[in-house]
Amino acid sequence: MSLQEEIIAQLGVKPIIDPEEEIRKSVDFLKAYLRKHPFLKSYVLGISGGQDSTLAGRLAQLAVEEMRAETRDDSYRFIAVRLPYGVQADEDDAQKALTFIQPDVSLTVNIKESADAMTRAVEATGAKVSDFNKGNIKARSRMIAQYALAGSYSGAVIGTDHAAENVTAFFTKFGDGGADILPLYRLNKRQGKQLLAALGADPALYEKVPTADLEEEKPGIADEVALGVTYNEIDDYLEGKSVSAQAQETIESWWHKGQHKRHLPITIFDEFWK
Protein backbone atom coordinates (compact mmCIF):
# COMPACT_ATOMS: atom_id res chain seq x y z
CA MET A 1 0.00 0.00 0.00
CA SER A 2 1.36 3.41 -0.96
CA LEU A 3 1.55 6.28 1.52
CA GLN A 4 -1.23 8.00 -0.41
CA GLU A 5 -3.47 4.96 0.03
CA GLU A 6 -2.60 4.75 3.74
CA ILE A 7 -3.50 8.41 4.27
CA ILE A 8 -6.78 8.08 2.39
CA ALA A 9 -7.71 5.02 4.45
CA GLN A 10 -6.76 6.68 7.73
CA LEU A 11 -8.77 9.82 6.99
CA GLY A 12 -11.72 7.90 5.54
CA VAL A 13 -12.02 10.00 2.38
CA LYS A 14 -14.33 8.84 -0.41
CA PRO A 15 -13.55 9.87 -4.01
CA ILE A 16 -17.23 10.62 -4.67
CA ILE A 17 -19.89 11.55 -2.13
CA ASP A 18 -23.63 12.09 -1.95
CA PRO A 19 -23.86 15.48 -0.19
CA GLU A 20 -27.30 14.81 1.28
CA GLU A 21 -26.12 11.48 2.65
CA GLU A 22 -23.06 13.09 4.24
CA ILE A 23 -25.17 15.85 5.77
CA ARG A 24 -27.41 13.23 7.35
CA LYS A 25 -24.38 11.25 8.54
CA SER A 26 -22.87 14.30 10.29
CA VAL A 27 -26.15 15.41 11.86
CA ASP A 28 -26.86 11.90 13.14
CA PHE A 29 -23.31 11.69 14.50
CA LEU A 30 -23.75 14.92 16.45
CA LYS A 31 -27.11 13.75 17.79
CA ALA A 32 -25.76 10.34 18.79
CA TYR A 33 -23.02 11.97 20.86
CA LEU A 34 -25.60 14.02 22.76
CA ARG A 35 -27.79 10.97 23.34
CA LYS A 36 -24.84 8.99 24.67
CA HIS A 37 -23.92 11.82 27.04
CA PRO A 38 -27.21 13.07 28.57
CA PHE A 39 -25.38 15.61 30.73
CA LEU A 40 -24.49 17.52 27.55
CA LYS A 41 -27.09 20.05 26.47
CA SER A 42 -25.24 22.19 23.95
CA TYR A 43 -22.63 22.41 21.25
CA VAL A 44 -20.23 25.35 21.11
CA LEU A 45 -18.35 26.46 18.01
CA GLY A 46 -16.33 29.51 17.02
CA ILE A 47 -17.63 31.08 13.81
CA SER A 48 -14.98 32.81 11.71
CA GLY A 49 -16.90 33.42 8.50
CA GLY A 50 -14.93 30.77 6.64
CA GLN A 51 -16.23 27.66 4.90
CA ASP A 52 -15.45 25.13 7.61
CA SER A 53 -17.03 26.80 10.63
CA THR A 54 -20.02 27.83 8.51
CA LEU A 55 -20.63 24.21 7.53
CA ALA A 56 -20.00 22.75 10.98
CA GLY A 57 -22.19 25.43 12.52
CA ARG A 58 -25.15 24.73 10.28
CA LEU A 59 -24.84 20.97 10.88
CA ALA A 60 -24.76 21.58 14.64
CA GLN A 61 -27.85 23.78 14.50
CA LEU A 62 -29.73 21.13 12.52
CA ALA A 63 -28.66 18.48 15.04
CA VAL A 64 -29.90 20.34 18.12
CA GLU A 65 -33.16 21.28 16.39
CA GLU A 66 -33.80 17.60 15.69
CA MET A 67 -32.83 16.69 19.25
CA ARG A 68 -35.37 19.14 20.63
CA ALA A 69 -38.08 17.76 18.36
CA GLU A 70 -37.28 14.11 19.05
CA THR A 71 -36.77 14.35 22.82
CA ARG A 72 -39.15 17.24 23.59
CA ASP A 73 -36.29 18.66 25.63
CA ASP A 74 -36.03 22.34 24.80
CA SER A 75 -32.76 22.77 26.69
CA TYR A 76 -30.68 21.52 23.74
CA ARG A 77 -29.06 24.41 21.90
CA PHE A 78 -26.25 25.43 19.62
CA ILE A 79 -24.03 28.29 20.77
CA ALA A 80 -22.16 30.12 18.02
CA VAL A 81 -19.38 32.36 19.26
CA ARG A 82 -17.51 35.05 17.43
CA LEU A 83 -13.88 35.16 18.57
CA PRO A 84 -12.30 38.21 16.92
CA TYR A 85 -8.88 39.56 17.78
CA GLY A 86 -9.78 43.23 17.98
CA VAL A 87 -11.65 44.13 14.80
CA GLN A 88 -11.83 41.33 12.23
CA ALA A 89 -11.22 42.51 8.67
CA ASP A 90 -13.86 40.20 7.21
CA GLU A 91 -16.47 40.67 9.95
CA ASP A 92 -19.17 41.02 7.30
CA ASP A 93 -18.46 37.46 6.17
CA ALA A 94 -18.82 36.21 9.73
CA GLN A 95 -22.17 37.95 10.05
CA LYS A 96 -23.35 36.42 6.77
CA ALA A 97 -22.32 33.01 8.08
CA LEU A 98 -24.35 33.57 11.25
CA THR A 99 -27.36 34.61 9.19
CA PHE A 100 -27.10 31.34 7.27
CA ILE A 101 -26.50 29.18 10.35
CA GLN A 102 -29.32 30.75 12.42
CA PRO A 103 -27.83 29.63 15.75
CA ASP A 104 -29.93 29.38 18.89
CA VAL A 105 -27.43 31.58 20.71
CA SER A 106 -24.85 33.97 19.25
CA LEU A 107 -22.12 35.36 21.51
CA THR A 108 -18.92 37.35 21.06
CA VAL A 109 -15.70 36.98 23.04
CA ASN A 110 -12.97 39.33 21.89
CA ILE A 111 -9.66 37.55 22.49
CA LYS A 112 -7.36 40.54 21.96
CA GLU A 113 -7.00 41.48 25.62
CA SER A 114 -6.23 37.94 26.78
CA ALA A 115 -3.89 37.10 23.87
CA ASP A 116 -1.97 40.36 24.27
CA ALA A 117 -1.73 39.86 28.04
CA MET A 118 -0.28 36.38 27.61
CA THR A 119 2.20 37.67 25.04
CA ARG A 120 3.35 40.42 27.41
CA ALA A 121 3.62 37.97 30.32
CA VAL A 122 5.80 35.59 28.31
CA GLU A 123 8.00 38.39 26.96
CA ALA A 124 8.45 39.68 30.53
CA THR A 125 10.57 36.56 31.12
CA GLY A 126 12.97 37.71 28.42
CA ALA A 127 11.62 35.29 25.82
CA LYS A 128 10.84 36.63 22.36
CA VAL A 129 7.36 35.85 21.04
CA SER A 130 7.51 35.76 17.25
CA ASP A 131 4.57 36.81 15.11
CA PHE A 132 3.97 33.16 14.23
CA ASN A 133 4.08 32.17 17.90
CA LYS A 134 1.63 34.93 18.79
CA GLY A 135 -0.68 33.58 16.09
CA ASN A 136 -0.72 30.29 17.97
CA ILE A 137 -1.45 32.15 21.21
CA LYS A 138 -4.49 33.67 19.48
CA ALA A 139 -5.69 30.24 18.34
CA ARG A 140 -5.26 28.82 21.84
CA SER A 141 -7.05 31.81 23.35
CA ARG A 142 -10.02 30.95 21.15
CA MET A 143 -9.91 27.35 22.36
CA ILE A 144 -9.92 28.52 25.99
CA ALA A 145 -12.93 30.76 25.36
CA GLN A 146 -14.90 27.97 23.69
CA TYR A 147 -14.21 25.54 26.52
CA ALA A 148 -15.11 28.18 29.10
CA LEU A 149 -18.47 28.64 27.40
CA ALA A 150 -18.94 24.88 27.08
CA GLY A 151 -18.29 24.58 30.80
CA SER A 152 -20.90 27.24 31.50
CA TYR A 153 -23.55 25.73 29.24
CA SER A 154 -23.06 21.96 29.73
CA GLY A 155 -21.61 21.76 26.27
CA ALA A 156 -19.12 20.07 24.01
CA VAL A 157 -16.80 21.95 21.67
CA ILE A 158 -17.08 21.27 17.95
CA GLY A 159 -13.92 21.27 15.85
CA THR A 160 -13.75 22.01 12.12
CA ASP A 161 -10.90 19.67 11.21
CA HIS A 162 -11.44 17.94 7.87
CA ALA A 163 -9.33 15.71 5.65
CA ALA A 164 -7.65 18.47 3.63
CA GLU A 165 -6.68 20.25 6.84
CA ASN A 166 -5.69 17.09 8.67
CA VAL A 167 -3.39 15.75 5.97
CA THR A 168 -1.37 18.97 6.07
CA ALA A 169 -1.75 19.40 9.86
CA PHE A 170 -2.87 22.95 9.11
CA PHE A 171 -4.16 23.70 12.57
CA THR A 172 -2.73 24.86 15.88
CA LYS A 173 -2.00 22.12 18.38
CA PHE A 174 -4.29 22.67 21.38
CA GLY A 175 -5.75 25.65 19.53
CA ASP A 176 -8.27 25.08 16.75
CA GLY A 177 -7.08 21.47 16.96
CA GLY A 178 -8.55 21.31 20.46
CA ALA A 179 -12.14 20.04 20.33
CA ASP A 180 -14.44 17.27 21.50
CA ILE A 181 -16.08 16.21 18.25
CA LEU A 182 -15.28 16.58 14.53
CA PRO A 183 -18.34 16.35 12.24
CA LEU A 184 -16.36 17.21 9.08
CA TYR A 185 -13.67 14.56 9.51
CA ARG A 186 -13.57 12.41 6.31
CA LEU A 187 -14.48 15.29 3.95
CA ASN A 188 -11.99 17.17 1.81
CA LYS A 189 -12.31 20.85 0.96
CA ARG A 190 -14.36 20.53 -2.23
CA GLN A 191 -16.70 18.05 -0.56
CA GLY A 192 -17.36 20.58 2.19
CA LYS A 193 -18.38 23.03 -0.53
CA GLN A 194 -20.77 20.41 -1.92
CA LEU A 195 -22.45 20.05 1.47
CA LEU A 196 -22.85 23.81 1.85
CA ALA A 197 -24.34 24.04 -1.63
CA ALA A 198 -26.78 21.25 -0.76
CA LEU A 199 -27.72 23.13 2.41
CA GLY A 200 -28.59 26.20 0.34
CA ALA A 201 -25.69 28.41 1.37
CA ASP A 202 -24.82 31.51 -0.64
CA PRO A 203 -21.79 30.56 -2.80
CA ALA A 204 -19.93 33.54 -1.32
CA LEU A 205 -19.76 31.61 1.96
CA TYR A 206 -17.67 28.83 0.46
CA GLU A 207 -15.96 30.44 -2.51
CA LYS A 208 -13.89 32.97 -0.52
CA VAL A 209 -10.14 32.39 -0.29
CA PRO A 210 -9.41 30.32 2.85
CA THR A 211 -7.11 32.00 5.37
CA ALA A 212 -6.24 31.35 9.01
CA ASP A 213 -5.38 35.06 9.39
CA LEU A 214 -3.34 34.60 12.57
CA GLU A 215 -0.16 36.48 11.66
CA GLU A 216 -0.02 40.26 11.95
CA GLU A 217 3.02 40.53 9.67
CA LYS A 218 1.17 38.53 6.99
CA PRO A 219 -2.46 39.60 7.37
CA GLY A 220 -4.95 37.50 5.46
CA ILE A 221 -2.30 35.21 3.97
CA ALA A 222 -4.05 32.48 1.97
CA ASP A 223 -3.82 28.91 3.25
CA GLU A 224 -2.57 27.77 -0.15
CA VAL A 225 0.30 30.26 -0.03
CA ALA A 226 1.28 29.17 3.47
CA LEU A 227 1.09 25.49 2.51
CA GLY A 228 2.78 25.74 -0.88
CA VAL A 229 0.09 23.58 -2.47
CA THR A 230 -3.49 24.21 -3.61
CA TYR A 231 -6.62 22.73 -2.11
CA ASN A 232 -7.49 21.30 -5.52
CA GLU A 233 -4.21 19.38 -5.46
CA ILE A 234 -4.79 18.27 -1.87
CA ASP A 235 -8.33 17.15 -2.69
CA ASP A 236 -7.18 15.28 -5.80
CA TYR A 237 -4.54 13.52 -3.71
CA LEU A 238 -7.12 12.55 -1.09
CA GLU A 239 -9.44 11.21 -3.78
CA GLY A 240 -6.71 8.89 -5.04
CA LYS A 241 -5.94 10.86 -8.18
CA SER A 242 -2.52 11.57 -9.60
CA VAL A 243 -0.95 14.91 -8.73
CA SER A 244 2.37 16.45 -9.69
CA ALA A 245 5.49 15.09 -8.02
CA GLN A 246 6.01 18.45 -6.32
CA ALA A 247 2.46 18.54 -4.93
CA GLN A 248 2.74 14.97 -3.68
CA GLU A 249 6.08 15.68 -2.02
CA THR A 250 4.69 18.81 -0.34
CA ILE A 251 1.54 17.07 0.94
CA GLU A 252 3.44 14.07 2.26
CA SER A 253 6.05 16.29 3.88
CA TRP A 254 3.30 18.12 5.79
CA TRP A 255 1.79 14.76 6.73
CA HIS A 256 5.03 13.55 8.29
CA LYS A 257 5.84 16.85 10.02
CA GLY A 258 2.38 17.07 11.53
CA GLN A 259 2.10 13.58 12.98
CA HIS A 260 2.57 14.84 16.53
CA LYS A 261 -0.56 16.97 16.15
CA ARG A 262 -2.70 13.90 15.47
CA HIS A 263 -1.77 12.13 18.70
CA LEU A 264 -2.26 12.61 22.39
CA PRO A 265 0.94 13.55 24.25
CA ILE A 266 3.66 11.05 23.45
CA THR A 267 4.25 8.22 25.91
CA ILE A 268 7.15 5.79 26.20
CA PHE A 269 5.03 3.22 24.34
CA ASP A 270 4.51 5.35 21.21
CA GLU A 271 6.48 4.50 18.08
CA PHE A 272 5.09 6.84 15.41
CA TRP A 273 7.64 9.58 16.10
CA LYS A 274 10.74 7.41 15.71
Curated annotation (Swiss-Prot):
GO terms for cellular component: cytoplasm. GO terms for molecular function: ATP binding; glutaminase activity; metal ion binding; NAD+ synthase (glutamine-hydrolyzing) activity; NAD+ synthase activity. Keywords: ATP-binding, Ligase, Magnesium, Metal-binding, NAD, Nucleotide-binding. Its EC number is 6.3.1.5. One of its GO terms (biological process) is NAD biosynthetic process. SUPFAM superfamilies: Adenine nucleotide alpha hydrolases-like. ATP binds at residues 46-53, 160, 189, 211. Deamido-NAD(+) binds at residues 140, 173, 180, 260-261. Pathway: Cofactor biosynthesis; NAD(+) biosynthesis; NAD(+) from deamido-NAD(+) (ammonia route): step 1/1. It holds the Pfam family NAD_synthase. It comes from the Bacteria. It is an enzyme of class 6 (ligase). Gene3D superfamilies: HUPs. HAMAP family: NadE_ammonia_dep. Belongs to the NAD synthetase family. Homodimer. NCBIfam families: nadE (TIGR00552), PRK00768.1 (NF001979). This is NH(3)-dependent NAD(+) synthetase.
